[in-house]
Every structure is written in C-alpha cells, then in structure tokens.
Amino acid sequence: MKKTEKIKAPLTKGVAKVPVIMQMEALECGAACLAMISAYYGKWVPLEQVRADCGVSRDGSNARNVLVAARSYGLEAKGYRFEPEALRTDGQFPCIIHWDMEHFVVLDGFQKDKAVLNDPARGLVSVSMEEFDRSFTGICLMMEPGEQFAPGGKPKSVLEFARHRLK
C-alpha cells in the first residue's frame, strides 16, 4: 500500500469488498475470517500465522482468541451481542459473526433483502434475511484499524497457494 493511500474505514451501509480467504481445515474459520478483515484494511497476514495467533486447536478457536489476535495486529476489536435487525441498522461492516452455533463468517453487509457473507468454507454467498435470522447466533466481532495498525504484506499468489497445499 502506498503511503498516500488512506486506510479504509468500516461501512455502516452497503457491502464491503472483502478479499476471500478460504480456510484450509474445518477448524480454522475464525482465523480465516480475521485474515479477511485484516486484508480488507490492508494488512495481509499469512493464514498459517493467523492460525497460530488465534490459538486454533482441535476444537477450533473462540471469539476471545480472535479478538486478542486482532488487537495484536493493531485492530480495535470488540465483541457484541446483536439482534439480526439491530445489526443491519447499527452494525459496521465488515465484521465477523458466529453462524449456526459452530462457524464464523465475515458479514460484508446487507443488500436489499439479503445478507452478503464471506464464508471461509464456501466463498462469497448471499442469504435471505430469513436464513440470516435463523443462523446468526447474535455474536458479532467488530474491528477497525487503531493507531498501531500498519498496512503491509501481500496476498498469496495462486502458485504459492497450490505449492503449499501440495507439500
């Protein structure tokens, strides 16, 4: 990122254009979501590093560990409990939400009668508000760059990704 470029601010309306970062293992959804949020703001951290920083274990990671890791990257990070409609009107996007009692996804925002999710297991998906109401557990992790945030790193190329997966 050039020094003249401004760091993005969270959105309160519309849909954020968040890079898709797919999880490599079922238990690293929280880490992959944090990697996506960090990349959105301009800091590309390898998923392997985010995994370690989130303390991903055989049980996955929890919201608290994701928040601690986010703060270590210079993000101001807080956890909230929201009703679905309140998140739609009062939320900041992108944010990480807990989904179906067992998964984390990035909520990029809302578009008409759909919620736009960046799911580290499936990619970019839109779901109806009915499905959103059913699956969103109410847990929301909001993050934005703080004073200590420093953009940097670069996205992995497809070749690097394939080489790592084929080892």
Task: Kindly label every feature range from the protein language model.
Residues 1-167:
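Membrane-integrated ABC transporters
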